[in-house]
Design a protein with these regions (language model features):
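Short, glycine/charged-enriched secondary-structure capping and boundary segments
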Residues: 108-110, 157, 209-213
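S-adenosyl-L-methionine
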Residues: 8-14, 149-189, 218
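Short loop/turn segments at secondary-structure transitions that flank enzyme active sites
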Residues: 44, 100, 148, 157, ...
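Conserved S-adenosyl-L-methionine
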Residues: 174-239
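Catalytic cores of enzyme domains
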Residues: 131-136, 143-163, 199
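Non-catalytic nucleic-acid substrate-recognition regions in nucleic-acid-modifying enzymes
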Residues: 2-138
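Structural beta-strand/beta-sheet cores of well-ordered domains, especially the beta-sheet scaffolds
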Residues: 4-6, 90, 136-140, 147-149, ...
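Short capping/connector residues at structural and topological boundaries
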Residues: 65-67, 165, 170, 230-233
Length: 241
């Protein structure tokens, strides 16, 4: 099965927590600011989305390259084999971010990337300049930092803190992955009682219970990869290891 360069994103300061989670699941990791890289196949995409408690998203790094002008950006994106990833009717919204780079206009970066992908797919699928975008969604992300561009596919969709178990929301509730991260920074492992004197909406207590019962935090939700037409729908992991 094909192996991908994957990475988890997380809130500021939680890199070491997510890194420890991934290593406990058996992955070799590399840490950057806001990202932890690891390799895996489709089963690992399912496993990490389902079981990681403290990450935000799991993305596939599709391509990395230097880009200091829009022509280079267009050509590098165009050169990728998009038909292998995107069906002809795919919706593919492009989110962009540019930091400390010559290409600093994020709307322009997004527009160029979108145009390059459309042009390539029109050529690959022998269309006449039109793509319907009526099918499933394949969220793409272009990030340029110090003139190094990375184009990625988001396998998660809504952030992993959206567990799916909360029916109603109180005022300013603590994010679920943040609560799990706080628990991971303590000795708590589910074998002894946890006292939360400021319960609020119960996020800490719920996340503690999930840890104690070894319940996957992604049990109640769907993910972007559920709609990828090349993704094996039979993959399911009931254990983080």
């Amino acid at each position: 099965m094909k192996e991908y360069q994957l990475y988890a994103t997380m809130g500021a300061g939680f890199e070491s927590v997510v890194n420890k989670e991934l290593q406990s699941m058996g992955y070799k990791t590399r840490v950057e600011n806001g990202r932890v890289f690891f390799k895996g196949g489709q089963e690992d995409i399912v496993r990490t989305n389902l079981w990681l408690r403290t990450a935000d998203r799991i993305k596939i790094l599709l391509k990395e390259f230097r880009a200091t002008d829009f022509d280079t950006l267009f050509n590098e994106i165009y050169d990728f084999d998009w038909a292998e990833l995107l069906p002809v009717d795919a919706k593919f919204p492009v989110q962009g971010r540019a930091v400390k780079s010559k290409l600093h206009s994020e709307p322009d970066v997004q527009s160029i990337v979108k145009k390059a992908i459309v042009n390539k797919m029109v050529d690959q699928y022998h269309r006449r300049g039109f793509l319907p975008e009526t099918g499933n969604e394949y969220p793409l992300d272009i990030h340029i930092y110090k003139n190094v561009a990375r184009i990625s596919l988001d396998t998660t969709g809504a952030s992993l803190f959206k567990r799916g178990y909360r029916v109603e929301h109180g005022g300013a509730p603590m994010k679920e992955n943040f609560a799990a991260g706080l628990l991971k920074l303590t000795p708590y492992n589910g074998t002894h009682p946890l006292i939360d004197p400021m319960t609020g909406s119960g996020t800490l207590a719920i996340e503690a219970a999930l840890i104690a019962k070894n319940i996957a935090p992604g049990t109640w939700r769907k993910f972007s990869f559920d709609g990828f037409d090349w993704f094996n729908p039979c993959l399911l992991y009931t254990s983080p290891s």
